[in-house]
């Protein structure tokens, strides 16, 4: 006998389809599980909204209690988060977020990792970056946009920037564990760089549907994104995927007459020219920094209200004299 498991079932309606939900929990956790797993159906609804239909309809969806935290086995997720919110009770210091991290993250892998799988573990950012970003979208779906911003900002403190998140190819070696949070932050940055949520969400769903049940390389996903966006994103992906640094915006502000002028430049890889939002306390303003100093007029405003929108873009900033 493996353990004294209690098995209970539920179902999730998706359009004209019915998805079987099976839960296997230790018998003494029956009442906890009956209540705790109620978050599964709203989560599946969010993920189907963003990524398309659950990819393993015939297999069903299962959670199986285990003595370890979790693993994304296809249609049979190992669950060991002790029926607690966050990561084994750690809510990551964001008030009001009470979801179970293991359920949400491992379920996200049904789309990112199980349905779409990388050819080489060097490109595991496709699994973990997109799946960690699925947590972000889940928060936006259930708790709203502002809580999503708080959640994505909190992910920054887990990034070490120790080495690139893409590993060497052909030698069975992963890149940095930053593939989780840094990968998510890269996608969040790309969403705001596009400045078009209709395009962004069609892009995410398009990747999920067009590469369903396929083995992919990182270049497949990057080419898909650049073609759909009709943008040259080579330097963007090179910076975030193939270096251990994030772009640094050096800047200074000067007053010319009644107006303030922003001088800035990127300290990043060659040809990095990502546009960026700043705010003068009245409105967001697009700027277009490059590697050389450029000047942007911000208008007449209270300088104390100036901010760089690093809540929307994963960058470092440095004010210089």
Predicted regions and their residues:
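Hydrophobic helix-coil surface modules that form long, contiguous segments used
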Residues: 1-104
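Soluble non-cytosolic domains of exported or imported proteins
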Residues: 30-41, 93-94, 98, 102, ...
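Generic, well-ordered alpha-helical scaffold segments in large soluble proteins
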Residues: 39-50, 82, 102, 106, ...
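Zinc-dependent metallopeptidase catalytic helix centered on the HExxH motif
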Residues: 41, 46, 79-80, 85-149
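Amphipathic alpha-helical substructures
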Residues: 55, 176-256, 262
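Acidic/His/Gly-enriched intrinsically disordered linker/tail segments
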Residues: 124, 128-189, 193, 211
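Beta-strand-rich binding/interaction modules
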Residues: 233-234, 249, 253-310
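Short acidic/polar inter-strand loop motif in beta-rich domains
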Residues: 310-321
């Amino acid at each position: 006998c493996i353990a004294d498991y209690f098995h209970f079932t539920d179902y999730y309606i998706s359009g004209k389809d019915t998805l079987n939900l099976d839960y296997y929990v230790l018998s003494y956790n029956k009442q906890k599980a009956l209540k705790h797993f109620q978050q599964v159906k709203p989560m599946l609804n969010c993920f189907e909204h963003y990524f398309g239909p659950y990819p393993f309809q015939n297999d069903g969806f299962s959670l199986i209690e285990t003595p370890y935290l979790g693993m994304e086995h296809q249609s049979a997720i190992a669950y060991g988060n002790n029926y607690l919110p966050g990561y084994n009770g750690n809510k990551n210091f964001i008030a009001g977020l009470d979801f179970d991290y293991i359920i949400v993250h491992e379920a996200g892998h049904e789309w990112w990792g199980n349905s779409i799988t990388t050819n080489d573990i060097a490109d595991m950012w496709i699994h973990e970056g997109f799946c960690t970003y699925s947590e972000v979208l889940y928060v936006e779906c259930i708790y709203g946009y502002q809580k999503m911003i708080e959640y994505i900002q909190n992910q920054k403190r887990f990034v070490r920037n120790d080495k690139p998140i893409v590993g060497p190819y052909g030698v069975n070696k992963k890149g940095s564990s930053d593939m989780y949070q840094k990968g998510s932050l890269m996608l969040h940055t790309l969403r705001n760089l596009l400045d078009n949520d209709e395009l962004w969400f069609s892009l995410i769903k398009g990747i999920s549907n067009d590469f369903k049940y396929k083995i992919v390389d990182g270049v497949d996903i990057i080419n898909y994104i650049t073609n759909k966006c009709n943008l040259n994103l080579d330097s963007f992906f090179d910076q975030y995927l193939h270096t251990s640094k994030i772009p640094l915006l050096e800047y200074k502000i000067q007053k010319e007459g009644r107006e303030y002028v922003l001088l800035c430049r990127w300290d990043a890889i060659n040809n990095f020219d990502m546009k960026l939002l700043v705010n003068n306390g009245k409105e967001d303003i697009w700027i277009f920094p490059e590697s050389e100093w450029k000047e942007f007029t911000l208008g007449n405003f209270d300088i104390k209200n100036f901010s760089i929108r690093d809540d929307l873009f994963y960058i470092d900033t440095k004010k210089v004299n």
